[in-house]
Design a protein with these regions (language model features):
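Short, well-structured N-terminal submotif of metal-dependent ribonuclease cores
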Residues: 1-30, 41-59
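Generic structural signal for small/hydrophobic residues in well-ordered secondary structure
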Residues: 4-5, 38, 75, 100
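A generic structural signal for short hydrophobic patches within well-formed alpha-helices
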Residues: 8, 35-38, 72, 114
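Acidic, PIN/NYN-like endoribonuclease modules and their adjacent C-terminal/linker elements
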Residues: 97, 101-125
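A general structural signal for well-ordered alpha-helical segments in protein cores
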Residues: 35, 48, 52-55, 72-75, ...
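Histidine- and aromatic-rich ligand-binding microenvironments
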Residues: 3-4, 31, 88-90, 111
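Active-site neighborhoods of divalent-metal-dependent phosphate/nucleic-acid chemistry enzymes
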Residues: 63-108
Length: 125
């Protein structure tokens, strides 16, 4: 399962619903984009050290998904499809969606705009 920034934040705050979903999923992957967004949030937090320590521990046990050439093809297809539908989504989320499609993994996110992406399964909590 791939996690979006809002799911990662909820997990860091011990949201029981998110923890339950992640426990059932077994493996978790974090897109490099999500890692950047989350670290930006940490930098603004009063609890910076606590969240950075939590993230460091988490990263020992989960994959970080990088963007590569195949990702760019998925990105282009998704962006074009959503533009044609008149339903654009934020650029970072396009990259996250592209990684989900590339790796055939569902996305844990509260952002319903991911539901517009053909071939992507979004899980909420």
């Amino acid at each position: 399962m791939i996690v979006d920034t809002n799911a990662l934040s909820a997990a860091a705050d011990d949201d029981p619903a998110v923890i339950a979903v992640l426990t059932r999923a077994g493996q978790m992957a974090i897109p490099v984009i999500v890692l950047g967004e989350y670290r930006y949030g940490i930098a603004q937090s009063r609890h910076c050290a606590t969240y950075e320590n939590w993230l460091t521990a988490l990263l020992r046990d989960c994959a970080v998904l990088d963007i590569n050439k195949p990702t760019t093809q998925h990105y282009a297809e998704i962006t074009l499809d959503l533009r044609r539908k008149g339903k654009p989504i934020p650029t970072n989320d396009l990259w996250i969606a592209a990684l989900c499609r590339q790796h055939s993994l569902p996305l844990l996110s509260r952002d319903r705009h991911f539901d517009q992406v053909t071939g992507l399964k979004r899980l909420g909590w």
